[in-house]
Amino acid sequence: MAFHHVSVMKQEVLSLLSPAPGHVVVDGTFGGGGHARAILERILPDGLLIGTDLDEDAVTNAQACFADVQNNFRIFHDNFSNIRAVLDQCGLAGANGIVLDLGVSLHLLEKSGRGFSFQREEPLDMRMDGSGGGPKAMDVVNAYSQDELARIFLEYGEERQAKRIARRIVQRREDEPITTSGRLADIVASAVKGKPGRIHPATRVFQALRIHVNNELAHLEKFLETCLDCLLPGGRLCIISFHSLEDRIVKRRFAALAQGCTCPPDFPVCICGNQPKVKILTKKVVKPSQAEVEKNPMSRSAKIRAMEKLAVEGSGAGGEDGRAKQ
């Protein structure tokens, strides 16, 4: 199956990640491999690129497209929240770089047939892992209470008309179950009051359902709790987010890791002994250029945050070769 995806802010990612020959780099959201191919060119001849993705189509495509560099490439059908376990499988202490692109691939939107897009009439599935397991989006909209649906739309979609939309869904599912993306989009559009906005009225509802079905924020939190253990000293982490929920989680975790002394400000000397664990590389989020937005409108809401793991006493200098740890 042809796999189409346009990578966002490729040059900015390369600049922040700074891959070099011999490095181990993990692309935790492999997709079509756009970022990965550019990274691989910079870590050859002795580097190792590791990819993870929940979408089996992405894994199959990667195996075919990167067959020419099989000694420098490994791909896993797994969630990025399990990168530490993946590194263990590879016999690695850590990586020199990790990149996550938290956006939904064009392939999932346009080719998967799983109802990710409100512009298509497809079965309302929304599971990124098409191999099965876990509830589908249609299970959620047909079985959850009105209050539960409203909470999901408000919490994960920041949808201000969440209660109104949830009420309409519950009403309409009594006529017949809601099983397709097109019908759900029509129901949401019929419930929304006010003049048409810049985005489709179903945008936030579809985002919320996708996040809930795939437990996306929990996986992001899990990864961020283990990210330091995944990086070698001097290793860098670069995360591209597309909505404020993800960005707030990343910003908060980066700030916590970069914080030093936590003693009250009126203490004359530090007694906590806490030291910063990372250096934040993006004092302000990096956004796409106007030229990129014009070329790829889907990039308009992208934001990059990046950090570098600081070397600690006894760990040696940063930037060491991850493959040497095998």
Swiss-Prot record:
The GO terms this record gives for MF are: rRNA (cytosine-N4-)-methyltransferase activity
Q: What is catalysed by this protein?
A: cytidine(1402) in 16S rRNA + S-adenosyl-L-methionine = N(4)-methylcytidine(1402) in 16S rRNA + S-adenosyl-L-homocysteine + H(+)
Family listed? Belongs to the methyltransferase superfamily. RsmH family.
Q: Where does S-adenosyl-L-methionine bind?
A: 33-35, 53, 77, 101
Q: Which UniProt keywords apply?
A: Cytoplasm, Methyltransferase, rRNA processing, S-adenosyl-L-methionine, Transferase
The protein in question is named Ribosomal RNA small subunit methyltransferase H
- Per the record, the domain of life is Bacteria
Q: Name one Pfam family in it.
A: Methyltransf_5
Q: Where the protein is mainly located, per its record? A: cytoplasm
Primary gene name: rsmH
The UniProt entry, under InterPro entries, shows: RsmH, SAM-dep_MeTrfase_MraW_recog, SAM-dependent_MTases_sf
**Known EC number:** 2.1.1.199
Native organism is Desulfatibacillum aliphaticivorans
The taxonomy runs: Bacteria, Pseudomonadati, Thermodesulfobacteriota, Desulfobacteria, Desulfobacterales
The UniProt entry's GO CC annotations, sorted and at most eight, read: cytoplasm
User: Example GO biological process term?
Assistant: rRNA base methylation
Where, subcellularly, is it found?
Answer: Cytoplasm
Q: Which SUPFAM superfamilies match?
A: Putative methyltransferase TM0872, insert domain, S-adenosyl-L-methionine-dependent methyltransferases
General function of this protein: Specifically methylates the N4 position of cytidine in position 1402 (C1402) of 16S rRNA.
